[in-house]
Amino acid sequence: KDKGPPPKSRYEEELRTRGKTTITAANFIDVIITRQIASDKDARERGSQSSDSSSSLSSHRYEAPSDAIEVISPASSPAPPQEKPQTYQPEMVKANQAENESPQQYEGPLTHYRSQQGSPSPQQQPPLPPSSQAEGMGQVPRTHRLITLADHICQIITQDFARNQVPSQPSTSTFQTSPSALSSTPVRTKPSSRYSPESQSQTVLHPRPGPRVSPENLVDKSRGSRPGKSPERSHIPSEPYEPISPPQGPAVHEKQDSMLLLSQRGMDPAEQRSDSRSPGSISYLPYFFTKLESTSPMVKSKKQEIFRKLNSSGGGDSDMAAAQPGTEIFNLPAVTTSGAVSSRSHSFADPASNLGLEDIIRKALMGSFDDKVEDHGVVMPHPVGVVPGSASTSVVTSSETRRDEGDPSPHSGVCKPKLINKSNSRKSKSPIPGQNYLGTERPSSVSSVHSEGDYHRQTPGWAWEDRPSSTGSTQFPYNPLTIRMLSSTPPTPIACAPSAITQAAPHQQSRIWEREPAPLLSAQYETLSDSDD
């Protein structure tokens, strides 16, 4: 409890005291994260213990009104939930005391909070004795699980952990318990039904992860402990958390947050999870992409191709895949994400077409970008104006070619601008993803969000060198060469290109930076998109 409450109670106290989720979202998130982390720690420490004890205890909690009560307050006061594993494990009594304390200490604020929540104030109001609270909880909190937004978010994160991490037995057992707890506390089940979408979904999600986990839950056990904690929270929350606060809103954001957290914090778990999931792609966030990978032969083949190339070319992929499982799609293929699916699907089937498309695209992207890069970096001496000129020249030629190509494959034409924007932004990004994020075009490729900084930083070298190789190593030299010739930049930079690109990356980056909004990029994109359209 000490662990959890201090940060939690700090914010959650505020929440409860204020009775409003006046706490800033940052604080919520902080609370959630802290709680999650603390719970993760606790869970890791207690892990199986807490999951086991929490499972049994959860039953106890639910069975014991006091416990249930604590559950109530914990619902609003995550501290007790964390505490529960601790407290319960150390002593149910302490937990009960804590329950009494927490319900009361939070009860006042909670009552405030609850009443604000508009929960049946009568039951809220009385800092009922734990049992009475349990009753009250059964009554009031059930309806609105006094779930603080933080708790709700935490629940969501927990949920996501459980779901994404495919948590661990804890979640499974927890949820088994939770069902039992639900059975033991059918009343809660009602609230669950009331909030059923979420609580049930949580329960369902967890059980679902549970089975999924089972093979891995041993592995996840520690990690799972995190979910274990989460599951405790989850089962507690799952029932207590009938988030009064609209689950969807926070849930979504939190899920995203939790996803991000997962992607960040879960990098390891993600990779670990990846064992349960498709290795490269943990669907932590881009489940869609994972799905896409599994479903889309193009993506699949591309990924394989990329993996092979990257593996052969060396660590780029390992970093990439390891770094962000779901993002290979973004980072690796120059263009797999946007309309590429349609246009490149045939491209995949048809290497020649692929060459054509990607050749053109690379001419445009690689060429113009390389011109940017190499003109910026290698040809830095050239006036900036020259760079735009040369880049635009290459762009024009490539865009014209693209138009020609576009005529053959309208998709490709249309998609290309996107792809180009994407790839360009991606590439320009890659050297300095951080800055590029600042870049206006950053948005153009959402992928950047997932495949962020590190990955890109790694990418630049192979992004240009190897990525072309995805369509054919020749293209890279070819494109830059031709484009460079087009842009009348000495072909020699080609040799320098990779190093120049990587080395120049910072410089070019800054330049590209300066230029990104500038006509060079914007104009090119405008032109390309317009001409293609």
Swiss-Prot record:
Cite the record's note on assembly: Forms a large corepressor complex that contains SIN3A/B and histone deacetylases HDAC1 and HDAC2. This complex associates with the thyroid receptor (TR) and the retinoid acid receptor (RAR) in the absence of ligand. Interacts directly with RARA; the interaction is facilitated with RARA trimethylation. Component of the N-Cor repressor complex, at least composed of CBFA2T3, HEXIM1, NCOR1, NCOR2, HDAC3, TBL1X, TBL1XR1, CORO2A and GPS2. Interacts with ZBTB33; the interaction serves to recruit the N-CoR complex to promoter regions containing methylated CpG dinucleotides.
Residues bearing Phosphoserine are 73, 77, 196, 214, 230, 245, 278, 529, 531
Motif CORNR box 3 covers: 357-361
Compositionally biased intervals (Polar residues):
181-204
List the gene name.
Ncor1
Where is the segment annotated Required for interaction with RARA in the absence of its ligand?
Answer: 145-148
Q: Which InterPro entries match?
A: N-CoR_corepressor
Which locations, inside or outside the cell, does it occupy?
Nucleus
Q: What is this protein called?
A: Nuclear receptor corepressor 1
Say where the protein is mainly found.
nucleus
A single GO CC term for this protein reads:
perinuclear region of cytoplasm
- Modified how: Ubiquitinated; mediated by SIAH2 and leading to its subsequent proteasomal degradation.
Keywords recorded for this protein, A-Z:
Biological rhythms, Chromatin regulator, DNA-binding, Nucleus, Phosphoprotein, Repressor, Transcription, Transcription regulation, Ubl conjugation
**Record-stated family:** Belongs to the N-CoR nuclear receptor corepressors family.
The protein's organism comes out as Rattus norvegicus (Rat)
* Chain segments carrying region Disordered: 1-21, 37-144, 165-254, 382-476
What does the UniProt function comment say about this protein? Mediates transcriptional repression by certain nuclear receptors. Part of a complex which promotes histone deacetylation and the formation of repressive chromatin structures which may impede the access of basal transcription factors. Participates in the transcriptional repressor activity produced by BCL6. Recruited by ZBTB7A to the androgen response elements/ARE on target genes, negatively regulates androgen receptor signaling and androgen-induced cell proliferation. Mediates the NR1D1-dependent repression and circadian regulation of TSHB expression.
Q: Where is the motif CORNR box 1 annotated in this sequence? A: 29-33
Q: Compositional bias of type Basic and acidic residues: which residue ranges?
A: 1-17, 38-47, 218-236
Annotated spans, ID1:
130-209
Q: Which GO terms describe its molecular function?
A: chromatin binding; DNA binding; histone deacetylase binding; histone deacetylase regulator activity; nuclear estrogen receptor binding; nuclear receptor binding; nuclear retinoic acid receptor binding; nuclear retinoid X receptor binding
Q: What is known of its domains?
A: The N-terminal region contains three independent domains that are capable of mediating transcriptional repression (RD1, RD2 and RD3). The C-terminal region contains two separate nuclear receptor-interacting domains (ID1 and ID2), each of which contains a conserved sequence referred to as the CORNR box. This motif is necessary and sufficient for binding to unligated nuclear hormone receptors, while sequences flanking the CORNR box determine the precise nuclear hormone receptor specificity.
